[in-house]
Amino acid sequence: MGLTYQLLPALVCLLACTSFIQGCKYDITLQEIIKTLNLTDGKGKNSCMELTVADAFGPKNTDGKEICRAAKVLQQYKRHDRSLIKECLSGLDRNLKGMANGTCCTVNEAKKSTLKDFLERLKTIMKEKYSKCS
């Protein structure tokens, strides 16, 4: 029982697309996060970048819990800040929550860093994750 010649190209395309999609689950989300973080760099002169936030990152920065914690920190910051940077952070917050995939987490408020340092560290982590996807 052979495949008809009309069906064969469709199956090849389907297989190729499936393997491409499975390469990295959050490829587009990571690109969007990195782009947003690059935009916030330009606003580094803003005084809100010197505000202190909870430092959500551990030494390895690889598990989903740390992404969840980063989303929580940004969510807490958004509640208290009314500046223009809030618009950028809302998209960032949404993307991080999506990557955390509904993971529940808590943030240790004892360790603090500036918002600028927090965002720089987050950008480094996202770039590392993106490089692993490529």
UniProtKB/Swiss-Prot annotation:
GO terms for cellular component: extracellular space. It comes from the Eukaryota. One of its GO terms (biological process) is positive regulation of macroautophagy. Glycans are attached at N38, N101. Keywords: B-cell activation, Cytokine, Disulfide bond, Glycoprotein, Growth factor, Secreted, Signal. It is found in: Secreted. The keyword Metal-binding does not apply. It holds the Pfam family IL4. Disulfide bonds join C24-C133, C48-C88. The keyword Disulfide bond applies. GO terms for molecular function: cytokine activity; growth factor activity; interleukin-4 receptor binding. SMART domains: IL4_13. Residues 1-23 form the signal peptide. Participates in at least several B-cell activation processes as well as of other cell types. It is a costimulator of DNA-synthesis. It induces the expression of class II MHC molecules on resting B-cells. It enhances both secretion and cell surface expression of IgE and IgG1. It also regulates the expression of the low affinity Fc receptor for IgE (CD23) on both lymphocytes and monocytes. Positively regulates IL31RA expression in macrophages. Stimulates autophagy in dendritic cells by interfering with mTORC1 signaling and through the induction of RUFY4. Belongs to the IL-4/IL-13 family. This is Interleukin-4. It comes from Equus caballus (Horse). The gene is IL4.
